Amino acid sequence: MTEINEVPSPFCGAGTDDLTIQVDGTSLKVIKNGCAINTPAFEQPLADTQPRVNGTITDLATAVAKAAAILQSAKQPLLGGCATDVNGMRALLALADKTGAVVDHMSFNNARSNILTLQDSGWMTTTLAEVKNRCDVLLVIGTDLESFTPRFFERYLWTDAAMFLENPVQRKIIYLGQAPSGNASSSPTGQDAQVFECTQDQLPEAVSVLRALIKGRPILAESAGGIPITDLEVIASQLKAAVYGVVTWCVTDLRFDHAELTVQTVCEIVKDINDQGSRCSGLPLVGKEGEQTANQVCGWTTGYPARVSFAKGFPEYDPFLFDSQTMINAGEVDAQVWVQAFNVNAKPLSVTVPTIVLGRSGMAFEQEPDVFIPVGTPGIDHAGHAFRMDNVVAIRLKKLRDAGLPSTAEVLTAIERAV
Amino acid sequence: MLIRLKGGRIYDPAQKQEGVVSDIYIRDGVIVNHPESASLADVEYDITGKVVMAGAIDIHSHIAGGNVNTARLLLPEQHRNFLARKLNHPFSTARWSATETGYRYALMGYTTVVEPAVLPINALDAHLQMADIPIIDTAGLAILGNDDYLLRLLRTGVAQNQINDYVAWTLHATRCLGLKVINAGGANAFKSNARSFDLDDQVPEYGVSSRHILQTLQRAACEIQLPHPVHVHCNNLGIPGNVDTALATMEAAQGLPMHLAHIQFYGYGNEGNRGFSTAAAKLIDGFKKHPNITMDVGQVLFAQTVTISGDVIAQYSRRHDASPNKWVALDAECEGSGGVVPYCYKESSFVNSLQWLIGLEIFLLAEDPWRLFFTTDHPNGGPFTMYPFLIRLLMDKDYRLECMAQLNQEAVAMSLLKDLHKEFTLYDIAIMTRTAAAQLLGLADRGHLMPGAVADIAVYTEQADKAAMFGHAALVFKNGHLVVKDGEIVGRRNGTAQIVQPEFDKQIERRLQLYYDQFYNLKLDSFAVADVSFNQSDNERFIRHSCGTPYLASHS
């Protein structure tokens, strides 16, 4: 039994790297600095380590050959999931290039709200260390921050030290929309966050009117999205008075149609405040299931984020056409590879076409895929690299145990060579 | 295997060879002495009459890192492909990709490219990207000067040796080749709500001036023996009248080596009806008085492009010029910043025409290709793929005049360019883009064709149209392997990353870890640059170059 310190997590997207993990053979136990996201993800027991073809246990070479044969005979393969590390994505994209596949990260429909905003009007954003060291007012839009990143407040807000704040516990936290699920947002001195609650479908209106107030437009209504205008004015004035205000949101929590328009309004609020002569920045919360890693690697490899088709012999980006669910529903896909090295519960959308799964050990299926290859989890079974939610920082993942599992990259490269 | 390149006309300023007809021999990726018998060669390329130069070196081109990738994702419409022939190499049809970057540089005979803006905290990202750029070698310059750690040291007034240790540690940790300073203190000040930042402005909260930051880092670069002088992006980029900033920065260098980047953007006066005029002559006058200074031009070329810079003050101030109308500003980890603003340089524009004219005036007035380097600050002044046109502009006065006829004539009337008759020779081009560039960077193993050099060699078919000549090399060898033939990629291989590893007192690592624990919640090991390549070990990937005396041009 060994203890490994300073373990970085590939699961939470925040690049948490202070976990202590006890390794006993192949079983892991988080003994320090765990959280509701990281602890179960690290402690997920190891199960199957051998590949299966049509439900029968076989060796890796046979499984790879079968996978290659499926892809070889497919007219339009899909490489979905895309939840892996940098090398896994490198190999996945090489396989896509060779087979003319569509590549689609499993969270792209969420990420799309941010990406469409970026591609339509751009944004001003910041990173975690800036939040920690400068942020004096944090506005959380429609998001339960502590369930997304349980240790966010502990690590980045209620800190002993901050470069530019004399008293970090005096930071103001404001929620608009979703109320927090716990009390992590209450300061160590007992100051609760200000919460201005409204429902999901009221949020677009509330955010739009907040922007109008920040821009000094006259508002005749007495409430917007169920929130009194006077309350929205309280938010506006605090954000404008901030020395370094930060507005954060998680698109996964914005579960209404055309959330990209609300994200855009949020990003324009940030720009408006800077236009008016004070500082403010946005912090999009993303990065679970290798999302940021997939988009970054796909960016430098193809020029586009992780929804790209290679069918025409060159990478083509369309945030709607290449939605794998849509393609499968329309019968446009005749084989799929599902890559999910992190989460046993994130399974392929459908197995109506020949399906190859590179999954985390322990993934269970209602309908057995044609090929299942258990792969190692980056940061547990092999070293690797992952991008943190704010993009600027890539972190190095450690190998914690040897369970004999191949990496995503090894398996995909073997399949690519066999095609 | 012994390879013979037979009968080419050699342009190698390192050997003062200007069109000398001679054979070149390559063995195991390296240029070797002529063997006793020519018949020993295993492979022979008859290049009789063709122009032979060392592989070209780009000292300043934004090809990797967080801001570059953000620009890619911001602008899918700028690099959409419609028809493309697959080469059966992965990603050969992906535009503005790592692959295309390597291929298109190689096609022009470039074999080494420096990414000049590596934020230390983003170094792992930059190296992951550079490792995916095929064929060409790369190197990064690590940015300091807006980072809290350095400004904190300066505020406390520590001894220079502590600064030196920090700079040396940074180069180790980032696996970079040199030191970059971008509008020293400006990005930090922007986070405290400054909207402009001059050489003698002080960073809020620290009370240290831009000048002090710059001079301290320059001294560190000299004392830890970085061969490449501190690489400086000055204050006030793009602002009319900023020639005075450039001249003040030359003075601030106090006779020590310093490189001023994309100086065209500082060749600006504020005269004339529109308050914008050329100050190239004044700039070059200062340049000639300061032999310790080297510069690269950052020529503007007419095209849709995107500006990518760590100078967030400059980028933010230009947000209303974004074309298309979208832009990104990023505050990055208490270390630096980024700004991405798409831009289209137009011949009809007075300002853009004058920028183009000023860049060429600087090229033609400088009279010293050992100190003045060829760049467009890719992609900020124009994409590197347009270099062949810029070479033609330098070598062909008639072509210059033809191009000037298309410009905004009010700008042309204010410019000296029509009266500048100089035409660069092939030898000048070889100095600027090969020999001097390698020496400036401290890369002794390249930029020349002497025995012992890495066999990075470009062979061109001489043509009257110099854009055609330099656009598609006839042959390009990378480490002795043929990678380009008749303007097509024929071999994909891995490049390497060039680094220096100056010495430092190891104590600093403990202090830095305490600092990162306190302010970052990050372990140094978590973002260390390691295992960056898919296909190479770090030992193969990183090529270490010697520290030594900073470059001072002695050939002028």
Language-model segment annotations:
Chain B
Residues 55-66, 229-237:
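Histidine-centered catalytic micro-motifs
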Residues 158-183, 187-373:
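Histidine/acidic residue-rich metal-binding segments in metalloenzymes
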